């Protein structure tokens, strides 16, 4: 199985399965001399880890990270940084009933026909459990970008199902389990998720990610445009079905006289481009939105086939998120950081 590495200079290779003994990653290309401890990485993993509220999966993983290499006396050496996260709360028995079935909307069917042999426990390699390793790697990138460039990344839930959230205060985002920027809508979100659980169903979401303090000039033309890399990175996240940069699909209805970001001696008058022109950062905030599908792991019975091609009914057991968009926030932040870190190193390598 290939396709487990992301990046050009700052690279991340993840490994492990949902119900295996551990997951982890190897981060290569981190500059030497940066202070780094497990305690620096842990807060980012804590933001993503499961079982923190009744509104997400009840699988309870501590997600304690171990640094195995690449750090000596509290500083990066420039060598590959190996990170390990133990899996401690697997419940593989929940998946015994579906080991010979293909769950609708999951990768079971495609993994089976591509590889001929799959780990059915929690989706194996296709599980979003893999994203914990991305968040750990992204933490290293975020720490570097903040310390050396004063670059900030912030993500939040923008919409759950048909419930649109009004942005009021970014200081509220990390104070609630929904990463919602409006404390007046928290109860509405809680009631929504409770209703979904009772119905045995799920719902999709929209998440927005901002990067502020991005140096002008990051990104490359043509195939390695910054927005192209961001779209590639975001689409690699489980359940993501759409990506918008700046105005995104709203640009379809806009006139050129409105959409163009006019400039003055003091800067841009708008940011419909989302901080990127010609694939290169303008210095304005980079704005990315992602659409996530509703998880197919629900208790509502559905039609499918088994490995023999016979039609059967399936009910998905296990512990799952009613809305995967909630915990996608720190994952999307991590992918933004990995892209910007990689492009920063690429920019330094070829430009003054």
UniProtKB/Swiss-Prot annotation:
Task performed by this protein: This reaction introduces a second double bond into the aromatic ring system.
Cofactor(s) it depends on: FMNH2
Principal EC category: lyase
Catalytic reactions on record: 5-O-(1-carboxyvinyl)-3-phosphoshikimate = chorismate + phosphate
One GO molecular-function entry: chorismate synthase activity
Gene: aroC
Protein name: Chorismate synthase
HAMAP family: Chorismate_synth
Residues noted as binding NADP(+) in the record, renumbered to the chain: 48
